[in-house]
């Protein structure tokens, strides 16, 4: 079943085949239950619409992934460019990507929430634990896992952009002063709340450096604000993903409990059989003892005559 979660982005036919294969393997985990793994025409119709929804979500997540990759490449370009005009263009493209990612991420969140509600409502026609229900639940979990991985990629990229800018300021400060900046100086430069006197004096000597640094600082601040807004969107989505993670843990716990119940039932049956054998043994010995006593009595009566 876990394999299905990592393979949930296959084509319609492949998804259907993988769902059947993975659920057949689940019989090893849930022995004693007899599931029908052949999809009926009604199952096919139900899953057909479901897989179309999955494909829509899949496409959106792939687009977000590509935008994140483009965002990473644009960030690399900002570190090497010396033109303020090019830097402004890169900033605008990065902000455009961030806005698009935010919009698509919100759409994915809404679609997954809707899909979850439909999965629950679908149990009125296809009971919980049925082949269709297990397929829908497992593939939905796979979508959530993919979304969580994409969110992790964004968080890593966000931290890398901030770290790169911090190192850039630190390097400029050292070139201007010959000293390493203190944490307080770094925070002032990053926040824009103040500046370091030695660095300012250096820029006064080279005003073109002042212009470039100011332009870069404004560009990075704009990008930071956009990244923080997107970060908040992903934080809201994290609640959705982590809640499902708790549910998955509950499912695993239920499977473990089911295994313990099966094991306990097997042990109880074993002890019951042992007790049954012991009871039969006691009945046999009592019967033999009764026969012996009867024989002794008969022999005694015959001897007394």
From Swiss-Prot:
InterPro entries: SNARE, Syntaxin, Syntaxin/epimorphin_CS, Syntaxin_N, T_SNARE_dom. SUPFAM superfamilies: t-snare proteins. Part of the t-SNARE complex. Vesicle trafficking protein that functions in the secretory pathway. It comes from Arabidopsis thaliana. Pfam families: SNARE, Syntaxin. GO terms for cellular component: membrane; nucleus. GO terms for molecular function: SNAP receptor activity. Keywords: Acetylation, Coiled coil, Protein transport, Transport. The keyword Isomerase does not apply. Residues 210-272 form the t-SNARE coiled-coil homology domain. This is Syntaxin-112. The modification N-acetylmethionine is found at residue 1.
């Amino acid at each position: 079943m876990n394999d299905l979660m990592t393979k949930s982005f296959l084509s319609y036919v492949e998804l259907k085949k993988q769902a059947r294969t993975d659920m057949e393997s689940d019989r090893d985990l849930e022995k004693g239950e007899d599931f029908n793994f052949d999809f009926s025409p009604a199952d096919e119709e139900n899953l057909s619409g479901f897989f179309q929804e999955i494909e829509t979500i899949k496409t959106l997540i792939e687009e977000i992934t590509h935008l994140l990759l483009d965002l990473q490449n644009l960030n690399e370009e900002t570190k090497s460019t010396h033109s303020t005009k090019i830097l402004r263009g890169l900033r605008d493209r990065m902000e455009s990507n961030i806005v698009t990612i935010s919009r698509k991420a919100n759409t994915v969140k809404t679609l997954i929430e809707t899909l979850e509600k439909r999965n629950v409502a679908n149990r009125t026609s296809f009971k919980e634990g049925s082949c269709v229900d297990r397929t829908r639940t497992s593939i939905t979990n796979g979508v959530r896992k993919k979304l969580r991985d994409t969110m992790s990629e964004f968080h890593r990229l966000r931290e890398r952009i901030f770290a790169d800018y911090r190192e850039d300021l630190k390097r400029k400060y050292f070139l201007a002063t010959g000293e390493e900046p203190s944490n307080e100086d770094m925070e002032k430069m990053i926040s824009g709340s103040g500046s370091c006197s030695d660095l300012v004096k250096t820029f006064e000597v080279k005003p073109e450096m002042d212009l470039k640094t100011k332009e870069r600082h404004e560009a990075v601040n704009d990008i930071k604000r956009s990244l923080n807004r997107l970060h908040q969107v992903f934080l809201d989505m994290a609640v959705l993903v982590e809640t499902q993670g708790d549910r998955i843990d509950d499912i695993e716990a239920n499977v473990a409990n089911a295994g313990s119940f099966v094991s306990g039932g097997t042990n109880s049956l074993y002890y019951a059989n042992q007790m049954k054998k012991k009871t039969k043994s006691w009945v046999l010995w009592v019967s033999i003892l009764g026969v012996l006593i009867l024989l002794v009595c008969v022999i005694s009566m015959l001897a007394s005559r």
